[in-house]
Structure formats: C-alpha cells, structure tokens
Amino acid sequence: MLNQRNMSNADFYKKAHIDRRHFSKILNNYSYIPSRNTVFLMCLGLELNMQQMRDFLPLLGYSYSTDIETDIIVGYFIENKIYDIDLCNEVLIKFGLKPLENLSD
C-alpha cells in the first residue's frame, strides 16, 4: 500500500504517529498483531476510504463495528476524509475514550 501511495516507510510511520521501532516490528515480525488502535492509526496514515478500511481491518484480525464507539468515531473521520490523527484523538477524549496511542503495543 505504501508503494501505491508513493510514500516511504519513514513518511508513513511519522504520519501515522507510529514509533519507528514499532513500525519495524509490524513489518518484520509476521506473527505480531498490532492493537486495534494501531491499525486505526495505520488506516488514517494511509488515508484509506471506508471500504479500504473495512477490507484492511480483517487482514490484521479485526473488523469494523458500529457497536464500538471508537470505531464509529474513526469511521466518521475516514468517511469524511479527515485524516488528522490529533483531531481524532481530541474527539475520542471528549467522548471519554482512549486516544489512538500505540506506544505500549
């Protein structure tokens, strides 16, 4: 996907707010499954549309659910092409939810 978007690894992990070491772990350790929130960071960093996100999540063992508040909020951002992770985190916090962090993955 990075090649399709003419994006370097460094550009991607910075845009997605993913630590370089964590990104390397995702890339090189095939048995490692990143957290759901990290996958959402990846979706926002890749600027996926809603269908692409729905197709991408199962590749990493997740699915989009309208029963999960975080999914609804991230889905809103994706649907409306708002790829600002900081703004998404602010909205999540305002709703009493955890921001999309990945440092402890």
Where are these regions (language model features)?
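Residues in the recognition helix of alpha-helical DNA-binding motifs
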Residues: 1, 15, 26, 56
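A short, Lys/Arg-rich alpha-helix, primarily the initiator
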Residues: 1-8, 86-105
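The alpha-helix within a helix-turn-helix
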Residues: 2, 13, 43
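Short alpha-helical DNA-recognition segment
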Residues: 6-25
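Helix N-cap / loop-to-helix initiation motif
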Residues: 8, 19, 35, 47-52, ...
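The DNA-recognition helices of helix-turn-helix-type DNA-binding domains
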Residues: 19, 30, 60-63
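Short, basic-rich loop-to-helix N-cap that marks the start of a DNA-contacting helix
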Residues: 30-44
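Short, charged recognition helix plus adjacent turn
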Residues: 54-82, 103
